[in-house]
Every structure is written in structure tokens, then in C-alpha cells.
Swiss-Prot record:
The keyword Hydrolase applies. Its EC number is 3.6.4.13. Keywords: ATP-binding, Helicase, Hydrolase, Nucleotide-binding, Nucleus, Phosphoprotein, Ribosome biogenesis, RNA-binding, rRNA processing. It comes from Saccharomyces cerevisiae (strain ATCC 204508 / S288c) (Baker's yeast). Residues 72-246 form the Helicase ATP-binding domain. The lineage of its organism: Eukaryota, Fungi, Dikarya, Ascomycota, Saccharomycotina. This is ATP-dependent RNA helicase HCA4. It comes from the Eukaryota. One of its GO terms (cellular component) is nucleolus.
Length: 770
């Protein structure tokens, strides 16, 4: 291959000057641009660089949305932005374009370190932002990185120092800020918080505060979300300086956006459904919309898992998928890819995909469980009707939830229409669920966990006017899930639940370092650490139907009149305290070690083994015990004892001798029986050979007896050698002039069966004489 033509020094200098002039001209256009006077409709109308425009054009981003036209010019001018817009309005491009342009104007390289930090509440949203960034920034030289949970931390640590644009979730970003040596945020240019209110709702407030405190105060900050809340306003006070609000009125002033936050092309409906009939209605809805692409939202991952497993076994006629936060990252990514490519599919999901995720061509969004607030409702229904396309949403409200929640929707200018259920389309699946749960204990366990998670979700809701815990029909709801009854539930306080949420989202490394002493050393509890792989195997807890949680759920209530004898004993103080054990150390000398480890030497030092027997009282005695002389004389005279002992032992020996004789006799008879059986088989084989040979030569054979050897021979008459066997059968030769073929009667010689040896000799002589 020919070498590429390299630019000389003069040419490179000229190229740099042109680039500097282009960037200065671009900055001038940005400063002169007034969005109030000039309302841009296309990306090319904005003062952005050619590489960015080329990437946008290749990705088919031509026309600006309302939020993009309002926020991008303000962000390009360097202002902090607090933005809110409808779902599906293009908020991702609204902050990615300013990020790329900021670094381009600053001539950012990989040696300058981290230039922009983008924080997303969920892994799926972070992955989507990263994919969009790689498309529109394909003609720039910036390096981008994605850091989320479920990925290899060491792999990320090795490369994070060379990244210019970092995208990730709050927990993993804070972990890298604590651990990564080469990650320097002192020169950070931009910070972007996507779905900021969701980050706060998920318990990331302390994590976000810790991240913001480590960043440069001279940075530019962008906060984006489809909804704004008071918590976002509080975060804006801490993170933003002299910020501009785009697409929303200031929440801190108490004003409310009069325009509805849902897309205009979205058709919204609701139905009033009793809690016990929700699964019946859901299954009937899926059966009647087999040609659609839909997302079904439930309140917890346990419910998603249960509904997916049961509906999958009932086969509604459409592809089913499920996605929730407890899945592995690889499974979540594969599910998202399959759902995006499919055209007719139903996805059961939690709120982990309710925000920001761009699902193409979703026809229906079904909310089986009532969302916690109107903002969550807006984000859920925003998964369809994106970018001006049509879509439909349906929410199922119980009679207890309907009135209060509809008032909250109407206050936000959202007025869904009411739908009536056709009884002909409704199908009850309660018998099928009961049959499935009866056959499969694991499904029953999933149903119990789904019941508990739903009841707890209602208990922890803040809006008690919508979620009335005391009016829940628990028995009917348990029956609708296929359960025989409502499981026991232990409720925790709200403070405990908030603390558990914070512990769940807290970085594990920080929790580990919190156990360090004054010297910074972490002393681990060795008693809780498995020593070998076998210890790990035995200490591993079962997560299926045999788990401890399952046993606690299914434990029957103890009867009050139960007998006191039936007591369940719990073992206590079973852990061995190492301080109480003696010091077991090997000797220092090699000879002593060899002697201690040698089995032969250790046995020699222990002496001879002794055999013990135990009496009825459980006391041990040697097999042979010697009596004292006094005890011996107490039983009588020595000669008398000797005579009694000999008589007793003689009787015992006589009985044993009789048994031995009987055993010997049986063995002898068995041996003789086997020998006779072998002789019979040999005689029969020999006779068959002689018969076949004589028939071939045309000779007549005379048989003695009945013709059956087993009937003719008895045990007493059986000879002992093979020589006598051949004398039992005789071959008669008629070659002396008598032709056996002349008559049939001539071939038969009738004789009486010989009884003695003399009879046999007489018969032989007669046969010889003819």
C-alpha cells in the first residue's frame, strides 16, 4: 500500500488557523443568536458545527421539536437549563447536541480528561443515550463511555481515564469517582441530569449530592425531565446557577403548566375493574389484541414475574416478554432488543422502563396497577405516541381508586375516556390459575410473593385518598391469583422502608469501607467467610420453593389447643468460639512433625485398643472381666461349678454339632443334586446324537423304559460314572437279512422293562439271537 500524503508544517498550521477561525465564527453566531427573534425549525438553522450536522443528518434527525428549538440555543450560549417537556418530544437530543458542541468549541482531546458527565436513573435509559450519542457524534473525535451496574468494574477502571463524555447511573459513577485514580473532574465542562425527578424518587438524593460536591463549580448544568417536582426545584437550587427554565414554569413559584403533559396524538382510556377481576380483564384484553404491540405495567417485579409465568403457560396467542429491575443486565438488554424488533408482542414491565426509553411503534400501554402519582402516569403512557405518532393507553382503576385519581388527572388537564367491558369478550382464568398453582409449587410460591408485594406497595403509598389499604379485598384478590387463601404479611414502618431503599442504592464499596477502623484497615469476620468451595456449596441458600422465605410463608398456623409435647426446638449457641478451643499447632521440629502426622506412630503412642460392651443400663464393660475370689466362692463349690459349666457347655456344643451336621447334610445333598442334573443333561445329549446317527444309517432303535430319562432314573439308581450311562440304551442292528422296511410291525420289538441285572443280560441274549 502506498503511504498517505502527510501534511507539512505549513499546511498543518494553515489548517489549524482555518479551524480556529471557524470556531470563532461559530461562537460569534451563538452569541448573536436570539431564540425570541429567530425561531429555528431545522437543525441546520442552529449555530452548530458541520460534524454535528452531518451526524444528525445521517441519523435522520432533520426537524427540530419544540423542546429542542427552545433549549438548544439557550444551552449553546452557556446557560444552566431546567427543562421539562412531554414524553417522546426529543429531550435526549436537546442535551446531547449542546454537549458535543461545547467540547468541539473547546477543542477537547482525550488528553484533557473528562469533559461532560451525563447521569441517568436507569441502565436502559443510559444505554439508549449512549447509542444516540455514538450515532450523532460519529464525525467527531471524542471518546464516550458507558458505566452502569452489571458490568465489569475492572474493565471500566482501566479505560475511564481516557473518556471525554461519560454516561452512567448514579451509583456506578460515584463508585468510579471514589476508586478511579485517573478520573479527574476538576476540568468538567458540562453536567447533565436526565429524568432528575426519577433519580430523586429512587433514593439517589445522597448519591447525587455526593457527585455534585466533587465537580467543578464552573461547570454548565442541564436538568431534563418530562415532569418537575419540588425535589427537582430543591436540586436546581444546589446545582444550577442563574438558570433558564424551558418548557415549564418555575415550580418554586407555585405555578402550574396549563398545557397537558401528554402527547396530543395519545388516546387515553380508563376502566373500572374490581381488584379480583384485573387478571381476567388483562388476559381477555391480550386475547382480543393479538396483532398489537403493547406494554403492560405492574407495580412490582414479583407481580411481573408471576403474570409472565402464568400467562406463558396459558398461551394467549402472542409473544410474551418480561422486564424488571431484579433481572441480570444481560437479560434486560436482550429483552429490550427483542421487543424493539418485534411487531406483535406483549411486554410485562415495572417502572424501570417507564421513563425515557424510546420503544418504536408501541400501540397500547396498559396500566394494571394504579401509578403512585400523576407524574408516573405521564411517563408510563409516554412510551407510546412518540414523535407525533398515534398511540393508546388504558388504566385499570378499582372502585376505591377511581374517584380520587381521576380528580388528580383532571387537575393536570388529563381527561381519559371511560370504556365499558363487553361481557362476551371477558374470560375468567381463575380455574386455570388454580390448576397451575396446584400442579406447580414454584408458581404457587410466586403467587404468594406477588400478593405480598402488591399489598405492601399499597401500604407504603403516600396518597392515602387514592390507595385505601383498609378497604383492600385481600381474600378475593388471593383467590383471583389462584391461591387458596391470603398469606401472612408483616408490615414495616415507612421509615424502615425508606432506609431500606437507601441501603439498596448505596454503593457497596462505601458500605465496605465504613467498617474500617481508625487505621483504615477493614477487619473481616472470618467466621462468616466460607473457607472452601465445599463450604460455599453447603452454605448456599436455596432460592426456589425450599427457601427459608417460602417455608415462612407456607407455615400453617399453630392451633391453640395443641399438646405441649409437640415443641419446636430452635438450636442456640451453635457457633464455635475459637477462643475456647485449644491451640492446635504443629511441632517445630521436622522429626516431631513426621511423628505427629504418621498414622502408625500415632497408633503406637495410643496403646492397644480395647473392646467394650454395654449392659442394659448403658454402662461399659470389657468383653472379658475377671471376678474376685470372694465373688467366685459365693456361687458355690468349685467342683460343682465345674460340673455345671461342663454340662451346660456340652449341651450347647451338642446343639451346635447337630446344626453343623444338618448343614453338612444339606450341602452334600445339594452337591449330589447338581451332579445328577449334569449327568441327566449329558445322557440326553448322547442319546439324541445316537438317534440322529442311526436314523441316517437306516437302523432301528429299541428303547428301554418310558423313553423319558428324567422319569426312568431315580436318585438311587443313578450310576456314578459316564461308562455306565451308555449301557442304558442299546442299538439293534438288523443287517442279518431282515429288512426293517418290509413291515412297520417288524421294526418294533416289544420287551418288558428289566428290573434286575439278570433280566438285562437275558434281554441282551435274546436280542443277539434275533
Amino acid at each position: 500500500m502506498a503511504k498517505k500524503n502527510r501534511l507539512n508544517t505549513t499546511q498543518r498550521k494553515t489548517l489549524r488557523q482555518k479551524e480556529d477561525e471557524y470556531i470563532e465564527n461559530l461562537k460569534t453566531k451563538i452569541d448573536e443568536y436570539d431564540p425570541k427573534i429567530t425561531k429555528a425549525k431545522f437543525f441546520k438553522d442552529l449555530p452548530i458545527s458541520d460534524p454535528t450536522l452531518k451526524g444528525l443528518r445521517e441519523s435522520s434527525f432533520i426537524k427540530l421539536t419544540e423542546i429542542q428549538a427552545d433549549s438548544i440555543p439557550v444551552s449553546l450560549q452557556g446557560h444552566d437549563v431546567l427543562a421539562a417537556a412531554k414524553t417522546g418530544s426529543g429531550k435526549t437530543l436537546a442535551f446531547l447536541v449542546p454537549v458535543i458542541e461545547k467540547l468541539y468549541r473547546e477543542k477537547w482531546t482525550e488528553f484533557d480528561g473528562l469533559g461532560a458527565l451525563i447521569i441517568s436513573p436507569t441502565r436502559e435509559l443510559a444505554m439508549q443515550i449512549y447509542e444516540v450519542l455514538t450515532k450523532i457524534g460519529s464525525h467527531t473525535s471524542f471518546s464516550a463511555g458507558l458505566v452502569i451496574g452489571g458490568k465489569d468494574v475492572k474493565f471500566e477502571l482501566e479505560r475511564i481515564s481516557r473518556i471525554n463524555i461519560l454516561i452512567g447511573t448514579p451509583g456506578r459513577i460515584l463508585q468510579h469517582l471514589d476508586q478511579a485514580v485517573g478520573l479527574n473532574t476538576s476540568n468538567l465542562q458540562m453536567l447533565v441530569l436526565d429524568e432528575a425527578d426519577r433519580c430523586l424518587d429512587m433514593g439517589f438524593k445522597k448519591t447525587l449530592d455526593a457527585i455534585v460536591s466533587t465537580l467543578s463549580p464552573s461547570r454548565q448544568t442541564l436538568l431534563f425531565s418530562a415532569t418537575q417536582s419540588q425535589s427537582v426545584a430543591d436540586l436546581a437550587r444546589l446545582s444550577l446557577t442563574d438558570y433558564k427554565t424551558v418548557g415549564t414554569h418555575d415550580v418554586m413559584d407555585g405555578s402550574v403548566n396549563k398545557e397537558a403533559s401528554t402527547p396530543e396524538t395519545l388516546q387515553q382510556f380508563y376502566i373500572e375493574v374490581p381488584l379480583a377481576d384485573k387478571l381476567d380483564i388483562l388476559f381477555s384484553f391480550i386475547k382480543s389484541h393479538l396483532k398489537c404491540k403493547m406494554i403492560v405495567f405492574l407495580s412490582s417485579s414479583k407481580q411481573v414475574h408471576f403474570v409472565y409465568e402464568t400467562f406463558r403457560k396459558m398461551q394467549p396467542g402472542i409473544s410474551l416478554m418480561h422486564l424488571h429491575g431484579r433481572q441480570k443486565q444481560r437479560a434486560r438488554t436482550e429483552t429490550l432488543d427483542k421487543f424493539n424488533r418485534a411487531q406483535q408482542v406483549c411486554l410485562f414491565a415495572t417502572d424501570v422502563v417507564a421513563r425515557g426509553i424510546d420503544f418504536p411503534a408501541v400501540d397500547w400501554v396498559v396500566q394494571v396497577d394504579c401509578p403512585e402519582d400523576v407524574d408516573t402516569y405521564i411517563h408510563r403512557v409516554g412510551r407510546c405516541a412518540r414523535y407525533g405518532k398515534k398511540g393508546k393507553s388504558l388504566i385499570m382503576l378499582t372502585p376505591q381508586e377511581q374517584e380520587a385519581f381521576l380528580k388528580r388527572l383532571n387537575a393536570r388537564k388529563i381527561e381519559p375516556g371511560k370504556l365499558n367491558i363487553k361481557q362476551s369478550k371477558k374470560k375468567s382464568i381463575k380455574p386455570q390459575l388454580q390448576s397451575l398453582l396446584f400442579k406447580d409449587p414454584e408458581l404457587k410460591y410466586l403467587g404468594q410473593k406477588a400478593f405480598i408485594s402488591y399489598v405492601r406497595s399499597i401500604y407504603v403509598q403516600k396518597d392515602k385518598q387514592v390507595f385505601k389499604f383498609d378497604e383492600l379485598p385481600t381474600e378475593e384478590f388471593a383467590y383471583s391469583l389462584g391461591l387458596p387463601g391470603a398469606p401472612k404479611i408483616k408490615m414495616k414502618g415507612m421509615k424502615t422502608i425508606e432506609q431500606a431503599k437507601e441501603r439498596k442504592n448505596a454503593p457497596r464499596q462505601l458500605a465496605f469501607l465504613s467498617k474500617a477502623n481508625e487505621d483504615g484497615e477493614v477487619i473481616e469476620d472470618k467466621s462468616k467467610q466460607p473457607r472452601t468451595k465445599y463450604d460455599k456449596m453447603f452454605e448456599r441458600k436455596n432460592q426456589t420453593i425450599l427457601s427459608e422465605h417460602y417455608l415462612n410463608i407456607t407455615k400453617a398456623q399453630a392451633q391453640e389447643d395443641e399438646d405441649d409435647d409437640f415443641i419446636s426446638v430452635k438450636r442456640k449457641d451453635h457457633e464455635i468460639n475459637e477462643a475456647e478451643l485449644p491451640a492446635l499447632t504443629l511441632p517445630t521440629s521436622r522429626r516431631a512433625q513426621k511423628k505427629a502426622l504418621s498414622k502408625k506412630a500415632s497408633l503406637a503412642s495410643k496403646g492397644n485398643a480395647s473392646k467394650l460392651i454395654f449392659d442394659d443400663e448403658g454402662e461399659a464393660h470389657p468383653v472379658y472381666e475377671l471376678e474376685d475370689e470372694e465373688e467366685f466362692h459365693k456361687r458355690g463349690d468349685a467342683e460343682v461349678q465345674k460340673t455345671e459349666f461342663l454340662t451346660k457347655e456340652s449341651a450347647v456344643m451338642a446343639d451346635i454339632d447337630n446344626i453343623d451336621k444338618q448343614v453338612a447334610k444339606e450341602k452334600k445333598q445339594e452337591k449330589k443334586r447338581k451332579r445328577l442334573e449334569a449327568m441327566r443333561r449329558e445322557m440326553e445329549a448322547a442319546m439324541e446324537e445316537e438317534i440322529s446317527g442311526d436314523e441316517e444309517e437306516g437302523k432301528t432303535v429299541a428303547y428301554l423304559g418310558t423313553g423319558n430319562l428324567s422319569d426312568d432314573m431315580s436318585d438311587g439308581d443313578m450310576p456314578d460314572s459316564e461308562g455306565h450311562l451308555k449301557k442304558k440304551a442299546r442299538t439293534v442292528d438288523y443287517s442279518h437279512g431282515h429288512n426293517p422296511s418290509n413291515s412297520v410291525d417288524d421294526d418294533i420289538i416289544e420287551v418288558e422293562e428289566p428290573q434286575t441285572l439278570e433280566d438285562l443280560e437275558s434281554l441282551t441274549a435274546k436280542l443277539i439271537q434275533g
